[in-house]
Regions:
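Eukaryote-biased, non-catalytic alpha-solenoid scaffold regions
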Residues: 1-148
């Protein structure tokens, strides 16, 4: 448990490490005990940032989850969520790289940031307003998902 918590603390402290290892954090977060509670609390984050739920016959996934349960890793979920709240904005895709003016993924990532950390969302939004003010479809998709 100490090594897991140490790794999570490293991710929280260093954004470069977070950017490199966020897919592993996503897998860990979805495998941790009680991670299903995130589905109700942060539905867009759960759908956008975390990997899709595996099938019941996914042996490796079941093995990881049972191992984490045996380790009593449940409290690690709070630390993992602290890391996400701190750094999720770093992996939001840049609208400048959108394909055919489809910004629905960008809007979903923004909504996920909004769910976890409203201050960071406000900062990201102000940056986007300056940089992407002329992308009407971006703002349309943001509005459609409930953001402005």
């Amino acid at each position: 448990m100490r090594k897991l918590n140490g790794w999570l603390r490293k991710l929280k402290k260093d954004k470069k490490i977070f950017k490199k290892y966020w897919p592993w954090l996503a897998r860990l977060t979805s495998d941790l005990p009680n991670s299903k509670t995130l589905k109700q609390k942060y539905p867009v984050f759960y759908k956008t940032a975390l990997p899709e739920e595996a099938s019941p016959d996914d042996r490796l996934g079941n093995f990881r989850r049972s191992g984490l349960k045996k380790m009593k890793a449940g409290p690690g979920l709070h630390l993992a969520m602290d890391v996400w709240k701190e750094h999720l904005h770093l992996i939001v895709p840049d609208p400048a790289n959108a394909y055919k003016s489809d910004y629905s993924d960008h809007a979903a990532w923004c909504k996920a940031v909004h769910e976890l950390n409203q201050n960071t969302y406000s900062t990201l939004l102000s940056q986007w307003r300056k940089k992407h003010s002329r992308r009407r479809n971006l703002w349309r998709d943001m509005k459609a998902i409930g953001l402005s």
